[in-house]
Amino acid sequence: RQQGKMMHPAFRKPLYQDVTAVYADSLNRDLVVSSDILCKEVHRGDIVYFCLSTRMDWVPIAWTVFEEDSLRFQDTEGSVIGCLATWNGKRLVMQSEPFTYDKMSGTIALLTPQSEKEDITLYFKFPLFCDLGILRMPGGVFEGSNDSQFRSADTLYYVKQWPFRLNNTIFPEKEKSYRYVRYKGPKGSYCNIAEMAFFEDTSDTLALKGRIIGTPGCFQKDGSHDYYKVYDSNPYTYMDYKTPDEGWVGLDFGIPRRIKKFTYIPRNSDNFIHKGDVYELFYWHDKKWNSLGRQVAKADSLNYVIPKGVALFLKNHTEGKDERIFKKTDGRQQFW
């Protein structure tokens, strides 16, 4: 108990120690929040909890006693979306709108619904920086050649940044014909790639056929992730070359073919939008998640109209558990 009030169970274990300061080091700071963001039912002397989201729930990670015009939570680190709450002895009662907490500056910004609406296109339900296969793609290159050893090759596309969707379509600038095409993974990538296909015209839906070529062998040493997996029509299997460097996979068309379009799918953890799955988008307001409707994905993206300035959560009702709170920033999803 604290000042006659019951503490949340997470803080009742006397041998627990907060080690935030040890790991956060110079980024460790006290979070200071103005009491203006609290709901009216919070009074002086009440214990207030700083909470982080875990899927659609909130978990307290720090507490303080509300005494003055602001609340101070000791030993915290930013780069999160948080929310304030009280404990009624049975459950947490959320007492603020969510807010972003910046790691570098320590500033917070409320995520409050605005009257103005805006469109958002969703491509995934979990942050890409948690997906190893996505991180390994920048620096990879798609090439075309008429030499089977690719000693003289043209660059069709150089991967500069993380692919942000499942199906990525590229239109090469070069108007040439090639007998051989390939994807060569960057150093340290094990040539991770799930699928790719080449097309003779931009309007084609039927991919060119050819003999699968590439560097044999996989990290698992059992053939389960060899280069031919890139052409098994399964977006969730992938090539995983036996060494970090020099892996590649491609096609021999038999004769030179013009390439006006190609598509690729990165190695992924199945957190992109999955065609046929049922999704529901929520936004937080008035102490709860509010539904913006369910959709059956018709492709690898979803389109919604949302209130500006809100915290969002995308739920896959068909499968999977990897889901995380996010907001719209510069037109794209930003996860916290």
Predicted features, each with a name:
Residues S79, E173-G185, V305-E319:
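Noncatalytic modules at the cell exterior or secretory-pathway interfaces
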Residues R55-W63, R91-Q95, S148-Y158, D204-L208, ...:
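Surface-exposed loop/edge segments in extracytoplasmic proteins
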Residues M7, K13, S96-S177, S189-R257, ...:
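Disordered, acidic Ser/Thr/Pro-rich linker "stalks" and the adjacent N-terminal cap
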Residues A24-I47, R55, L128-L132, N268:
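Structural motif
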